[in-house]
Every structure is written in C-alpha cells, then in structure tokens.
Amino acid sequence: MPTAFPPDSVGLVVPQMAHFSEPLALACGRSLPAYDLIYETYGQLNATASNAVLICHALSGHHHAAGFHSVDERKPGWWDSCIGPGKPIDTNKFFVVSLNNLGGCNGSTGPSSLNPENGKPFGADFPVLTVEDWVHSQARLADLLGIDQWAAVIGGSLGGMQALQWTITYPDRVRHCLAIASAPKLSAQNIAFNEVARQAILTDPEFHGGSFQEAGVIPKRGLMLARMVGHITYLSDDSMGEKFGRGLKSEKLNYDFHSVEFQVESYLRYQGEEFSGRFDANTYLLMTKALDYFDPAANFDDDLAKTFEGATAKFCVMSFTTDWRFSPARSRELVDALMAARKDVCYLEIDAPQGHDAFLIPIPRYLQAFSNYMNRITL
C-alpha cells in the first residue's frame, strides 16, 4: 500500500469518459447509435500534438495501464513497468492515451451497459466487433483529443493487432507502430483454444443465452474454465515447471477427484475464480471473436506484403522465445512481409522463459530494447 509513489510512477490518475453521439457503423453490418469510451492519459500533450502515443490493450485489458487510482490502491496499472517518467514510454516526453475498448466491461459501452432502446443490459444482443471497429472508435477519440497523428501506436498480443490495423486503416495518422508478442492472424490452434473457452461460457447453465444479468446470476463456472484454459496458453512449460513442478498442496495424495492436490491446480483455480468475479462473460466472447476474425490480408488476396503497401509508419516488432501462443515465427512472418513491402522495420526476439505473458513483465533486456526504440522517435 503506497504512501508515496515511486519517482518513476505517473502517480494518481483519474479516468475520463468520452461520449460519442454519431452512429458507428460496424463490420458486422450493424451500428451503434451512441457509445462511451473510458480512458486515461499520462503526461502532457505538446503544443503541436506531435507527442501522442496510443496504448491498445489485450483480451482482458482495460484503460488503467499506469499509475494509481488512489493512495490505497495496492497494484498500479497493468503496464506500469513500461509507462512513466524515464520508462520505455516516457511520460516526460510523450502524452499517453490508454482506453478500454468498445465492448469492454470496465466503463466503455459494452454488453453489460444498458441498451437505450429497452433499458435492459445489451447482453448477447451487443453487436459482434472486429479489430477494425475498435480502430475506428479509437480514431474518433483521437479527434476528440485534438490528435491528428499518433507518434506511436503500441500494443501487445491483441493490442499489437490493433496497432497493425491502425497502419492499414489510417496510414497517415500513425508514425510508429510497435507490435509486441502479436501475429498477423490467429493460427487454427489459437482459434481452437478460443472456441473451447467460448463453449465453457456458452454451456454454463447460468449463462442464460447471454441474459444472465437480467436473471441476476453470473456464469462463474464457465468464465472460470475459460480463464483457466487461456491462462495455460499465456505461460510456458518451462515457467510452469519452475514455478510449480509437481509440487503438492499437502503432504500426500488424496486419491479422489475433488481435492486440489497439485500447486498448479490451486494456481489455475485461483486465477479462474479471481477473473470470474471481475470480467463480463459476453465481453469475453466478443474479445475472442475479434481475435479470431483479425486477418487484414484477407482483403488483399491473402498477400501480407500487399496489405502493408500503403502504410507509412515505421515498425518495431518484438517477440519472446517461449511464447507458443504467438510464437516468434509469427512475428518473423510479419517482419518478412513488411520487408517485402519495403517498410522500415526492426525486429527483436527476447530470450525469456515467461511465455506469452512476457510482454507484461519487466524483463531488463526487453525494457532496454523498448526504451532504445522509443528514444529514437522524434517529435
């Protein structure tokens, strides 16, 4: 519990809400007549608005990327190791914007929001979203903030996909793109993992076809299982072996199916329980579908190099050796396409045992490489 914030912290931050009354047309063919986006900012926008950086979050992320909401808050924002004075995304230099995406469950309009047409939660009636839909909504937020062009758009995992989409959809509005632990599209295996997670939610009796809020319940079991499956894919075999091995919770085996016997079982159950108490099931379905649908090359004859021909940004691609969810091979595929499109791109593969979640962890070589690239950005 901090009584004084570290000197490299952005300190206390206050979330802000932006309301948009102009309808937003969506890829699914529907539209949202109006919507809200909750966001936070760190640092100061300079006179020419040339120092703005957009942070795009991953599947379960949100707007609170850095700093603290109160002096009593135990943990800072989810990317606090990378955002702040003297950190890779240096708030002495950059004005940083972090939002909760449309369809989220942390303040932006999403399935748990009230539908103005009937006064009930949207639930399963909330439209299916794509990465491109998010980028369009983010562009409107940029307009509201007076930002014509981002100095950089940065994201890890699903956030990296949004950063890439920015360079395709709004090529003149982003100067640098940093895609970390990401991929140009999901593999069949990744789609399969997402489907298992969705089925865990959809088949939970408490899901009620997505109208669980009206029923006054939560599909806790389904969300818990979905998170447990997902969390396994975010870690590496080495990191799980080092952290848990075959360690037992007690001194002996119980020879039953109900006891939590292994430490790794206890860890996964804790992660699932904690997640199911704070995340919306319909939002989880939306986020995984947006992941599945992301395939920008599909609009360019499946030619990834052609996809980026119109991009004007400079690119930085980073991957982690033990990430098997978005493996280094997928990042190299992206780098090869960018090089074929004659784009300015640098690539770094970090040797790290933490798996996919490594992009969230303050690994010294990763932070140093991140800082080196950001220091090169001129305003």
UniProtKB/Swiss-Prot annotation:
GO molecular-function term, one example from the UniProt record: homoserine O-acetyltransferase activity
Subcellular localization, as worded in the UniProt entry: Cytoplasm
Q: Does the keyword Glycosyltransferase apply?
A: no
Pfam families recorded for this chain?
A: Abhydrolase_1
Catalytic site: 157, 323, 356
**Assembly and interactions?**
Homodimer.
Q: According to the UniProt record, what class of enzyme is this? A: transferase
EC numbers, comma separated = 2.3.1.46
Site Important for acyl-CoA specificity: give positions: 325
Q: According to its UniProt record, which protein family does this protein belong to?
A: Belongs to the AB hydrolase superfamily. MetX family.
Q: Please state the pathway this protein functions in, per its UniProt record.
A: Amino-acid biosynthesis; L-methionine biosynthesis via de novo pathway; O-succinyl-L-homoserine from L-homoserine: step 1/1
Q: What does this protein do?
A: Transfers a succinyl group from succinyl-CoA to L-homoserine, forming succinyl-L-homoserine.
Q: Which UniProt keywords apply?
A: Acyltransferase, Amino-acid biosynthesis, Cytoplasm, Methionine biosynthesis, Transferase
Q: Name one GO cellular component term.
A: cytoplasm
InterPro entries (alphabetical): AB_hydrolase_1, AB_hydrolase_fold, HAT_MetX-like
Protein name, entry field? Homoserine O-succinyltransferase
Q: Where is the AB hydrolase-1 domain?
A: 51-360
The record lists the catalysed reaction(s) as: L-homoserine + succinyl-CoA = O-succinyl-L-homoserine + CoA
Q: Where do the annotations place substrate binding?
A: 227, 357
Annotated GO biological process:
homoserine metabolic process; methionine biosynthetic process
- Organism of origin: Pseudomonas fluorescens (strain SBW25)
**Presence of keyword Transferase:** yes
